[in-house]
A protein has these predicted regions:
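Expand to "…catalyze enediolate/carbanion chemistry for C-C bond making/breaking, isomerization
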Residues: 1-112
């Protein structure tokens, strides 16, 4: 489970779509399941507790990138549930570390 903190324009198709899928799973854990169940104690889940507004904004950034690339988005999040902080300031890996991780994957991400 990973929600990157890198600007979505730098993600390859594979990672952009995967993050979108993971973000929806995370959103459901935190909203529908009230932070309970399978991945509720995962570090990626825990860093978004109290930051649904920031998670919503990340989703919207992904959707804007979808639009730029001509992808069709059909899974909006309920904005009414986007509460809490609009800023994510907890990182599992720093931005620099995330770029290294993506470079090591030898994918088509555009990280410099």
């Amino acid at each position: 489970m990973r929600v990157w903190d890198i600007n979505p324009k730098h993600l390859c198709r594979k990672h952009l779509l995967a993050e979108h899928r993971e973000l929806h799973g995370l959103w459901n854990i935190l909203t529908k399941h009230k932070g309970q169940g399978g991945y509720s104690r995962h570090p990626e889940t825990l860093r978004w507790v109290g930051k649904l507004k920031a998670l919503y904004e990340r989703h919207e950034a992904l959707v804007r990138e979808f639009d730029k690339r001509g992808y069709h988005h059909k899974t909006p999040l309920d904005k009414r549930l986007a509460r809490g902080s609009s800023v994510q300031n907890v990182f599992i890996n720093t931005l620099a570390e995330q770029k290294v991780i993506l470079r090591q994957k030898k994918c088509e991400c555009f990280v410099v």
